UniProtKB/Swiss-Prot annotation:
Residues 142-151 have a biased composition (Polar residues). The keyword Ribosomal protein applies. GO terms for biological process: negative regulation of translation; translation. Part of the 50S ribosomal subunit. Belongs to the universal ribosomal protein uL13 family. One of its GO terms (molecular function) is structural constituent of ribosome. The lineage of its organism: Bacteria, Bacillati, Cyanobacteriota, Cyanophyceae, Oscillatoriophycideae. This protein is one of the early assembly proteins of the 50S ribosomal subunit, although it is not seen to bind rRNA by itself. It is important during the early stages of 50S assembly. This is Large ribosomal subunit protein uL13. Disulfide bonds: none annotated. Residues 126-151 are annotated as: Disordered. Keywords: Ribonucleoprotein, Ribosomal protein. GO terms for cellular component: cytosolic large ribosomal subunit.
Length: 151
């Protein structure tokens, strides 16, 4: 009889990946990043454990959306005070805080519990091409989020 083996937390090797978001589609990029953060790309995937890897996303200010989403997609936040709702379009948020767009997209694709919050801390997003994680020796990961290979 075979038994299911649960990996120990010490035996997991967590890699670092760097992904360039230039001209990548937002939703497709976020989906792939969420899979890597959860560890679904590994044979040791366990739903209740953090078996995923660290992901660094660079050039977050150059992420693309299709159609009219740049003017119609809205991001809402609330201060907690009466009348404190702030609404911002994709374009304005991309000019102001471009990394928040990718963070919100990926966070929405992670579990809504303590594990999801822990996984989210392994995502590092930077608006430009530079990041401070060279010491971790991240691997370059190329994702093709453009359907039919356009561009």
């Amino acid at each position: 009889m075979t038994k299911t083996i649960t990996p120990s937390s010490q035996g997991l090797d967590q890699k670092w990946y760097v992904i360039d978001a230039t001209d990548q589609r937002l939703g497709r990029l976020a989906c792939e990043v969420a899979k890597i953060l959860r560890g679904k790309n590994k044979p040791t995937y366990t739903p209740h454990m953090d078996t995923g890897d660290f992901v660094i996303i660079i050039n977050a200010d150059k992420v693309a959306v299709t159609g009219r989403k740049s003017t119609q997609k809205l991001y809402r936040r609330h201060s907690g005070r009466p009348g404190g709702m702030k609404i911002e379009t994709f374009e304005k948020l991309q000019q102001r805080i471009p990394e928040r767009i990718i963070e919100k997209a990926v966070k929405g694709m992670l579990p809504k519990n303590a594990l999801g919050r822990q996984l989210f801390t392994k995502l590092k997003v930077y608006p430009g091409p530079n990041h401070p994680h060279q010491a971790q020796k991240p691997e370059e990961l190329t994702l093709n989020t453009i359907p039919n290979g356009d561009k």
